[in-house]
Each structure stands twice: as C-alpha cells, then as structure tokens.
Amino acid sequence: MIWYVATLIASVISTRGLVAQGAHGLREEPEFVTARAGEGVVLRCDVIHPVTGQPPPYVVEWFKFGVPIPIFIKFGYYPPHVDPEYAGRASLHDKASLRLEQVRSEDQGWYECKVLMLDQQYDTFHNGSWVHLTINAPPTFTETPPQYIEAKEGGSITMTCTAFGNPKPIVTWLKEGTLLGASAKYQVSDGSLTVTSVSREDRGAYTCRAYSIQGEAVHTTHLLVQGPPFIVSPPENITVNISQDALLTCRAEAYPGNLTYTWYWQDENVYFQNDLKLRVRILIDGTLIIFRVKPEDAGKYTCVPSNSLGRSPSASAYLTVQYPARVLNMPPVIYVPVGIHGYIRCPVDAEPPATVVKWNKDGRPLQVEKNLGWTLMEDGSIRIEEATEEALGTYTCVPYNTLGTMGQSAPARLVLKDPPYFTVLPGWEYRQEAGRELLIPCAAAGDPFPVITWRKVGKPSRSKHNALPSGSLQFRALSKEDHGEWECVATNVVTSITASTHLTVIGTSPHAPGSVRVHVSMTTANVSWEPGYDGGYEQTFSVWMKRAQFGPHDWLSLSVPPGPSWLLVDSLEPETAYQFSVLAQNRLGTSAFSEVVTVNTLAFPVTTPEPLVLVTPPRCLTANRTQQGVLLSWLPPANHSFPIDRYIMEFRVGERWEMLDDAIPGTDGDFFAKDLSQDTWYEFRVLAVMQDLISEPSNIAGVSSTDIFPQPDLTDDGLARPVLAGIVATICFLAAAILFSTLAACFVNKQRKRKLKRKKDPPLSITHCRKSLESPLSSGKVSPESIRTLRAPSESSDDQGQPAAKRMLSPTREKELSLYKKTKRAISSRKYSVAKAEAEAEATTPIELISRGPDGRFVMGPSEMEPSVKGRRIEGFPFAEETDMYPEFRQSDEENEDPLVPTSVAALKPQLTPMSSSQDSYLPPPAYSPRFQPRGLEGPSGLGGRLQATGQARPPAPRPFQHGQYYGYLSSSSPGEVEPPPFYMPEVGSPLSSVMSSPPLHTEGPFGHPTIPEENGENASNSTLPLTQTPTGGRSPEPWGRPEFPFGGLETPAMMFPHQLHPCDVAESLQPKACLPRGLPPAPLQVPAAYPGMLSLEAPKGWVGKSPGRGPIPAPPATKWQERPMQPLVSQGQLRHTSQGMGIPVLPYPEPAEPGGHGGPSTFGLDTRWYEPQPRPRPSPRQARRAEPSLHQVVLQPSRLSPLTQSPLSSRTGSPELAARARPRPGLLQQAEMSEITLQPPAAVSFSRKSTPSSTGSPSQSSRSGSPSYRPTMGFTTLATGYPSPPPGPAPPAPGDTLDVFGQTPSPRRMGEEPLRPEPPTTLPTSG
C-alpha cells in the first residue's frame, strides 16, 4: 500500500515536470514562416504529454500581436473559438499548431501560442512560443484616380495612385507610353502626379504603374482639359475654275464638345455677303461649300470654331478662282501729257495673269513696234516717250491668258493735254531744331488743276503735319520722326509730277542703325551695321547680344570703339543660337534698337569615322625547308566578308621586317622562298589584303638556311649555277686575251714597221725650195710615215728609231752606238744621283774607240777591216753631209778651206763627224755640263758675253747692234784661261722636235705669233716668242698680262722684260745708240711673274783639235725628262731644234709667189706628221699671219744627232744672229743655281715646203705631262736683220687659251712619270 502511493506521487511529479518543460521551454527562439497569399501555412506549437498515464487537460490559445483577444482557442474536445477574420480559415493542427488557409496580406505579423494546464496554478507560471508570419503578395492598388478626370485650361490637377504588396511596390506615371519625371510641368511623389498650368497639350491618357518582384499593377486615367476648341485640321488653299464648287474643310476638338463653326470672307461673315450668302453652306463638321464660284468669290476665308469657353481659335485659307482675261473699267478718255512721256493703259483682270495684250487703233490692229518712241510694257500698257498728234485716235485692247479672253475692252479716246507743272518748288534741304515750326512751300498748276499731296519716303511719319491749300507742308513742332526725305506730288487726270526735299531735324537722339549683318564662325561673330543719323551730335555704338533661348533680361552689352561700324565678338559657344542688335547713343540719349538678327555659330567639323572592317590574319603559317629553298604554307583567314585580294609575305633576319613579296594571289596558300643566304636564321609572316585593308600579321614561322644549299651537281635541268658561271667567265677571259693579243701584235708590228722605215731615212742636208729633184713626196713614193696617224706612240718611243736587225758597223760607229746606248740608258733611268752619274760616266766613257784588228790585237781608232771613208761636207755646214740630191752643195768644206770660216766653227769641226740619218747614230755627250753664271739685269752693253759679227763686214747701217756674216762667241774670259768644253744640248726625248723635210702646206705656223717689224727698213726679228707658264713653286703662276715688247735685238736678255725694263729705260750710259720705238705691235707672250730676272747663257768655245770624246765626260742624268719636246716655230733665218738637241738654220730663198698665197713659209705644228699636199689646203685654225710670197725658205738640215749647230753661208751681207737655249737638266742643277737661270722664249722656226722629210714619230699630246709643276721652255730665238720680214698676221689666240712655250695647249702628264720640280731654262748665244 505504501509502495503504491509513492509510485503515484512520483509519476505525478514527473508528469508535471514534463508538461511544465514542454509548455515553458518549447522553442524559446522565435520562428519565421513565409507564405504566398492564397496559400495555406502551419504555425507550429508543440505539447509533450507524459509517457504513461492520462494526459492532463489543457487549453491552447493563439494570439496575434496587436489583437487583445485570442484569435483561436481550443479546449479538449470542445469546438474552437475562431476570430471572425479567420473564420473558416483557422484550425488546430496536431496538438497545438495553428493552420491558416488562404492567407492574406493582412494575416502577416507576429503570432503567440499559449498552452494552459488546468491542474496547475497560473499565477506564477507562463508558457508559449512566438512565430512571425510573412505574406508575399503582388502589388494591388488601394487608391486610384477615376478613369476620366477633367481639368480647366490654365489650372493644375493632381492624380494619386496607391498600391500595396509584399515587398512594397514602386509606383510610376506614364503619358502616352512615356515615363514622366519631375519637371516644371509635372511633379511625381509617392505615387501622386501633379500637372501644373494645364493646357490643351496636357490632355490625354495617363497610366499609373505599380510593380515589384512579385508582379505589377496598372491603372489608366484620361485627362480632359476644359477650354476653347482646338483646330485639328485647318483649311487649305484651293484653286478652282470659274463656275465650279469650292470646298474648304475645318475640324476642331474641345471639351465640352458643343462646337459651332463660323466662316468669314475678307473678315466678314459669309452669310452677310449678299452675293455669297445664297451660294454657301456650312456642314456640322465645319466644312464650307461655295457653289458656282465667281471671280469675285476669290479671297481669304477664315474658320472660327467655338464652345463658349475662352477665346476661339481661327484658321484661314485662300480661294483662287481662275478665269479668262478681261478688261475692267476701261476709261472712255485717255489723257496723255504733251512734251513728256505718257502711258496708254489697259486695266486687265486675269487669273492666271495675262500673257498678251493686243491693241487696236481706230478699229485696226496697232503695231506698237512700228511707232517711233512707243514701247509695249509687260502689263500690256503702251509707253509713249513724246506724244504727238499722230497718237490721237480711239483705242481698244484685248487681253489673253492661258484660259483665253473675255473679249476686248470698251473704246477709249486719246486726248493730248499739257501736264501739270510746279509753280513753287521746295528747297533741296531744310535743317531745323526739334520742337520748332517749319513750313516747306510747294505749288503747282495745270489743266485740269492738279491736287498737291505730301508723302514721306520710307517709313511714314506719325507726327503732326498737314498740307496747306496752297500746297505747302507745315510742321508745328518738329520731332525726331520728321527727319528724312519728303516728296511733293501734283496729280491730275493727265499725270503726276513730284518734287523732293530733305528734312534734317537737329538736336535729337541718334536714329537707329540699319542693315545689321552678322558673319559667324565656330566661336566668333563679326557684327557690322550702317549708322543712322546722329541727331546733330557725335554718336557711339554698342552691340547687344544674348543666347536665343535666354529671356529678355539676359542681353549683354558690348561697347564699340569710336570710328568703326563693326565689332568682332569672340568666346562664343559652337553650334549655338545667338541674337544681336545695335544701339546708338549721343549726348541727348539713345536710339531705338536696330532689328534683331539671330544666327547660329558653326559646329566643330565632325568627321564620321569609317566603319572598321576587321580582317582576321591568316592562320597556321608553316615553313618547310627543302634543297631549293623554303616552302611557306598557310590557311586563309577564318572570318572575312569579302574575298582576299592578295597576300603579303614578310621576312626578317634581325629586328627589322622586310617585304619578300607583296603580290601573292589571294587564291594561293603557299609561297616558295628562294635565294636565301646560307647559315642564316629567317623568320616569316604573312598578311592578308582585302579591299585596301591589311590584316594583322599571322604567326611567325622560323627556319634556318643551313641545309638549304647542297653541293652543286648536274641535274636533269642542266648545269649547276657555279659551273655555268665558271664557263661564262672562262669564255670571257679567253675572248679578252685574244683581243688583247691581237691588239698587242698589231702594235708591235706597227712599231717594227716604223723602225724599218726610219732606217731608210736619207741623210740630212740643205734642202732648197726651188730644186725640182725628186723627194718622197714629189716622186710619188710616199713613205708610210708621211700618212698621218691618230694613234699616239708608246712611252718607249726613244727606242723606236732603232733598226730591227743590226748592221755591220765600223769601230767608230760601234763606239758611237755603244756610247749612245749607255747614255740613253742613263737618261731613261728613273732613279738618279749625282754620285752615281759621275761614277758611271767615269767607268763607261771611253777615251778612244777600241776595236780588234785583223791580227786579233785591239787597236784604237778606225778599224782596218772597215776603212773610214771621209765624208764630204757642205761648204759652210761642216755638220751636214753632201748628198746626190742637191748638187749645189757638193763642195765640201775639206776641199775648200775658206779662210773666212769663223774660229768657232773651226774649233767645232773636230767634233762634227759624219753621221747617218738613222737615229741609231748618236754623238757621245760632251764631258761638260754647262755652268750658268748669274748676270745682272742690265742692257746689252752691260752683258759679259754677247753675239758679235765675226764674218765679213756689212755696210754700216743705223742699227741698234752690229752683226757680222757669221756668228761667234764673245766671252769675257781672258786668253790664259782654259776654255770649257763645248756645250751639249741633250736629247729632248721626243721625235716631235726633229726637222721635217716636207713641212705642211701652211702659210703660217700653228702658233700664229706676229713678227717683230724691223726699224729703218730692216727686220728686227722674224721669230715669234711664245712662252709657257713655268711655275717656280708648287702653285700655278699667275700669267702676266699681254705685255708690250719693243724688241731691238735678241742678243741681250733685255728682250724678255716688259716695257718698264726695256733697255731704253736704263741709264743712258748703258743704252745702245739706237733703240726700237715702243710703238711696235705687242708680242703675244705670257711671261710668268715668277721669273725674277733674265740671265744670258753662252756656250763655251770648243777646243780646236781636240776630240769631243777626250777628257772626262759626265754621265747624262738618269732622270727621264718630263717636259714637252721642242716645238717647231715659224721664222726665217733661225735655228730649228731637233729631237737630238740640234738647231737648224732656215734660210730664205726667193721664189715667185704661188697662186693663192701658198708660196710662203710653212710651219711645223705640234703634231709633226707627214703631210700630203692638196690642191687647196685648208688653213690651220691657228694661222696668225702670212709670209711674203716672194720669199721662200731654205732649211738647213743637219744630222739629227749633231750636238751643235753652225750658221750657214749666206749670200747676203748679214747673217742672222742666233740665240740657242738649252733644256734645263734638273739632275745636274742645284737649287741655288736653278734660281739664276735665264728664261728665254723659244723662236718659231720656218721650213721649206719642199724640204726633205725627217723620219720622226709624232707622239700624241696625251703622252705629254700636263702638270703645271714643270714645263719645258727650250727654244731658239733668231734676229734675222738681213732678211725681209713677212707682214704681220691676224691676232694671236684667245686670252682664255692656256698655251705652252710653243703655243700648244698643255696636255695631261704621262702616266707613271714622277713630277719634276720647275726649273727655268737657260739661254745660249752661239755663232757659227
């Protein structure tokens, strides 16, 4: 029994605890439940019952926050208590949960669940759980405006639209589908829309839209504006023909819509027009119908709708009635003034306007153009310049238009009348102050009496003025508006006449400017105007401007400087509308504003970019290496709307891309690259071109060219390229070798022929021009050398004269030949030293010629095997052999020892041996090098040695110098002194200077220098004196001007000085007795200013009886001469210099003149070649004078290898005095001695036209040295006082031509020669 009670108590206690825990500790945290409107939801609330036993009774209550009583109560098995709002929707779910069906938005909120245990005390115990219910609902309107809403025009109206939903919806307003935002016209706030200043444009449908994520709701309201009607379709202009019906439409809208329409014609109701009211009708929609229109119905029609609210609108249109042309109110009498122009008018009425008006006079058609002074005007009127009685008559007119005509006018009679005239004319100008009275007179008369009226030109005046009966114009108080032009008009039926005057009102404000113009740019505007009247005071201007959209109070004033009537306004906005006006002001006030001009500034130039058409690059570029090159392959671009035009292939080796090919067809997908460099890394890329657009480059493909180049081998296509190139090169080399071999063979053959021909040259002899003996020219046997050749000889021309085969020579000949070869070898050597030359001379110079005799012993002198045959000499010319060609010279000088032979000639005889004509024969050079002694610059009397006459005396004559028959030496040495060896004249190294037996048939020399006329009937000199520019330093000398050389003789060096150093200018004690006048023609000499003075050089006398070979003979210089050879010059009785250093006297011989003047002396030019005579030889371009035809020259031809020359015997009393000048020898002269050498110009040597030719080559000028550092100046000068002088020739060559010593143009230096230092030449006076 006790156990049972304890168990019962424990169970009760445990049950109470569980219930209390379930009721009090159930879900202490609130629960949130979300549901969509219209769906069902369960609000959970749990109760835990005991495991065993009977559950205690309890009560379930559900509360909603904000509602004081429970919305749901349930106890046991009793029916629940449900709030009316939840009736039918709330029920108990499970033990204590609440189930709500079809939830609503208002069901949202906090709910509390309470469970009450009936067996417990509730005073101190509370339990329950909280649940928040959220209802998601689409927007729904809770407040909306009515479907139609009215508003008065000019007022405001507000339309409100409220919506509810979860989440809260957003409310917006739209008008005709356009979203309305906050503005001056509309105000939108919290779903309300307010329209201010309602106008007719505000009428229409307005839509309220509420939307959220759950949906949207829309409501539409129509706004009706109460006001006057609004014309929706105004009437339009129409054109109808006469008698048709016209229809004018007019439709309007209004609220309220009780509309009435009224139509007006010319501002009068159509129903008030008597002729129109019966033919019009107005329909209910406002259309006006006019039946059977007439021309008078045309005009403006106006439609006015009305609904009794406000001011009714109106709209107008014009009715045009077309009809044929007609004449209205033709006057019966037409008055035309006399003496002035008048009109005959036809009052035409036509629609369309009349095109032709025809006139009839007195019932006949009138041809207006046939009447003088009559003109038919465009309106059909006739203008008469001056009416006469011929114009009198009756006129009718008939107008026509496109619709025809309504007939002719009524007849009108023309009457001539005098026009009115002014009896009082107003003045030209009137000036009066403002506010004062003014009277302007005007009066007229006529028949009928005219009526006088006044009018203002331009803007009419509104001031108080009136016209008096007399016609005058009266102003009681002048105002600013009275200023301007006024006209007095006198009118009667005949015509109207006018008279003008100008009225100036002083003391007013300025008048408004006019003609305002504005020129705009993007940011500037140039405003210009025409100033108005200033009112009598100085006025200024200001420009007013504003933006067009701004109000009337936004004008900005800009002052204008005094003077100009324009202003440049800057800082404007582009593409903006501006308004401009101009205002004038003076001391009395401002003018009215000018008209307002509105302009728009220019907009910035907008360049619309062309749409970019992107071309994708080619794809998948690959490079495959082959033996022939690199094969590049690619795929076309992936996207391209147009076909590919072409591809561009580029490559690079370094950093820079270069184009390989830019014309690969667009249809190709590969390219083969050839001719690549070996062992080089190449990178390639390709670009696509489509319609002038270039794509981006493709991917880069790299390849090395190491294995591209295989060994050259023979393929089917042919030989490899290197093999082919080698074959071509070999063929070219063989062809060139054959060509050069052929040329060399020809050259050698020609040289051999020249040597053979030279060996056949005859010995030199005196040639007489008058002899008719055969010569190589006259006999027809022309030597090949006589033919001119254009090829220059080689530099080795020194050896060209040697024969091809050796001859058997005598010991003397062998001696001469060996010495010649040795001497020439020494001369031709390029390296030279004084010590070497002396040593070689001592070692090689023989004392006597050694030869082997018959017994084998060596003997000196001539060999017995070859007995020496003493050659015969020409008398007076011991250096020339006698030949069979000229018998007049057969007498030898050995057989006839003339006691008159000069001592100098006798001394030279042992040195003169017979010579052959071959150039192989050569006299050994004398063992003496001339030493040049300086002489002072003195006259002839002051010289140490000079030429004197040693032959037989001539009759005394007044001459500046005395001459004998022969030349000799006059030395200052004492008798006891040892005479020096004979002077040696070296070989010039060129055959050009050798004597030519048959000179060219030129009447004058190639140099053309004038001769020096002789004083007192005698020639001073026949020689010409060309002089080269011989620089003394490295720079080219400045040539002297053309000096005037009055020559008195050539014995002294004074002839080389200009006139200020002439012997006539020295002291009287040193002057000769006679001196040539200075009026002689100037010699064409160009003497360099570098020569400090002139030194005379005399040759030493030879030793009598001594052989030239005895004694020490200095070796010739080894340096090769690089100056020009001696050139032949034209002169009579002078020495001719040969290639072996010979002077050849040229003797005159009288002969009758030949026709054409060709009998004179011929000259020997620089290009010494054989000349073939022609019937009429062409004159040389260098011809400067002609010789006298009565004189012919005799050329003395000595052996070309003779070292010295002697004077020939002359039949005349005097013989020429010769001055021989030797070539400078740079190898034997020191610098100190060179500066003292006298420069003597070479003389021109003349030759006979029929003399024996000399076998010499003619080297071209191209082989000459053209360097100005050294030029030869060797020559001979002769004073032939006993010979007549030829007349002077033409002028010398132009000053611009640079000439050498022989008048020739310098040519370039021979290749390979060393330039020689310039040395002045020497002068040698000789006599023979």
Swiss-Prot record:
Subunit structure: Found in a complex with MAGI2 and NLGN2, where it interacts with MAGI2 (via PDZ 5 and PDZ 6 domains).
Expressed in which tissues: Detected in brain.
Omega-N-methylarginine PTM sites in chain numbering: 1136
Domain Ig-like: 30-115, 139-226, 228-320, 324-415, 420-504
Extracellular side: 18-722
Region described as Disordered: spans on this chain: 758-817, 914-1040, 1106-1328
Localization per record: Cell membrane; Postsynaptic cell membrane; Postsynaptic density
Entry keyword set: Cell adhesion, Cell membrane, Disulfide bond, Glycoprotein, Immunoglobulin domain, Membrane, Methylation, Neurogenesis, Phosphoprotein, Postsynaptic cell membrane, Repeat, Signal, Synapse, Transmembrane, Transmembrane helix
Positions in the Cytoplasmic compartment: 744-1328
Transmembrane segments: 723-743
PROSITE patterns xref list: FN3, IG_LIKE
Record domain Fibronectin type-III: where: 512-604, 614-708
The protein, known as: Protein turtle homolog B
An annotated GO cellular component: dendrite
Compositional bias per record (Pro residues), positions renumbered to this chain: 1284-1295, 1318-1328
Record PTM: N-glycosylated and sialylated. Not significantly O-glycosylated.
Gene giving rise to this polypeptide: Igsf9b
GO molecular function terms noted in the UniProt entry: kinase binding
Glycosylation sites: 241, 258, 624
UniProt cross-references to Pfam families, sorted A to Z: fn3, Ig_2, Ig_3
Compositionally skewed regions (Polar residues) per UniProt: 1018-1033, 1129-1141, 1199-1214
Comp. bias regions, Low complexity: 990-1001, 1246-1273
Keyword flag Transmembrane helix: yes
